[in-house]
Amino acid sequence: MKKLIAMVTVLALAFSVFANRGKDAGGINWPKKSINLIVPFAAGGNSDVNARTLAKYLTQELRQPVVVTNVAGSGGTIGAAQVKDSANDGYTVLVHQISMHMAQVSGMVNFGYQDFEPVCVFSRASDEVLLINAKQHPDWHTYQDVVNATKNEPGKYRFTANTGASTQWIGIAVQAAGAKFNVVSSGGSGERLQLILGNHVDVTELNYSQVIDYVKNGTLRIIANVSTERSDILKDVPTLKELGVNCGYSYDNTFFMPKGTDKAIVAKFAAACEKIIKTNAQYKADLEKLYQVPMYKNPAETTALYKSQYDALMAIRDQIRAGVKK
């Protein structure tokens, strides 16, 4: 009888070990297959570069492939909607930033950060800057030069903005501050770069890391910093706020999962990101080469950040929807 009891006990323990094989301390057996990071913008932009840089380290940390898929269009809303409507099993993750709010506040879509599970902020982009093509406009050296030109010939000069994204906010703000641009719609940062290089637009906003080579060789010229304060990298470039434009922000690249995703999965993915961001020296070096800033905010901190951004934009919702601040 004792032998029988002992055998049953051993079998029970063996079954328990087998049943829980692959589960972590949180009691979840995840991930069991590849994870798809959806970047709702074209390849080569800020969100894409940051996601791809972290993805290779997440693949090592989570021991499953972490791949990036670009689903561009409509200011990031197509890719965001795809993730929102995906299964909440932890295998589809959205990469987004402050421009998520613009689509919702402007009325382009009826969903926003509230319809996802915020996972974590994983990096901050280098300075966002306003640029001109120096070869196209050799006499424009400052932001005020550009504004004066638009006032002299209202509607002639084109400012490109991604409708429903953060660049639309800039377009509204510079017009409200007195500029007389023809604000035209465009795609994400990759498309805007090609437009300004090809002389198809006169002013655009891009991440400094995307344009540093063009700035150094004299093709593009920076006329303003979109960040809330001057940076160490661009000490001599004034911010829009300094120039009298009521606009300033940073791109905090963020992961979101579909609403209802198991909190344990959210926590495990966030913890993997935190470990890489805070302890992996090679990851930090990779980001710094791209002029990006490693940053981590946990799910609660990320939710609080996005609420504050959303509330700030909702305060000027009518102005955003009208297209011009009154």
Regions found by a protein language model. Name each.
Residues 85-90, 106-191, 252-286:
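Hinge/capping helix and adjacent helix->loop/strand transition within the periplasmic-binding protein
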